[in-house]
Amino acid sequence: MSEQIDRYVSFKNIDCNARAGQMMDALQPYIQAAENPFWAYFQQKRAEFNAKGYDDLRVLHNYLPTLKELIEDDELLAQLEDLEYTCM
């Protein structure tokens, strides 16, 4: 039986940084395809945020509404929404 996680009590046992990294990896096809100017902007802002010491979870959180709008893969969108619910 899996352990029940209560994110409001603690983020203990939730590796949000790893989940955010996996999400960034999953977004690479969108970024590389560059079919929308947002992706170049997103990549630039990610680099700026990371240089300031902010992690990828913060970057994803800042652009969450736009990401939800642009992601066309239902499975990837579900992963993003799970990340939002669990870690943000």
Swiss-Prot record:
Instruction: Look up keyword Acetylation and say if it applies.
Output: no
Q: What is one GO biological process annotated to this record? A: nitrogen fixation
Q: Does the keyword Transit peptide apply?
A: no
Q: Which InterPro entries match?
A: CowN
Keyword line: Nitrogen fixation
> Which family would the database say this protein is a member of?
Belongs to the CowN family.
NCBIfam families attached to this UniProt entry:
N2Fix_CO_CowN (NF033689)
Job of this protein:
Is required to sustain N(2)-dependent growth in the presence of low levels of carbon monoxide (CO). Probably acts by protecting the N(2) fixation ability of the nitrogenase complex, which is inactivated in the presence of CO.
Q: Protein name, please?
A: N(2)-fixation sustaining protein CowN
Per the record, the gene is: cowN
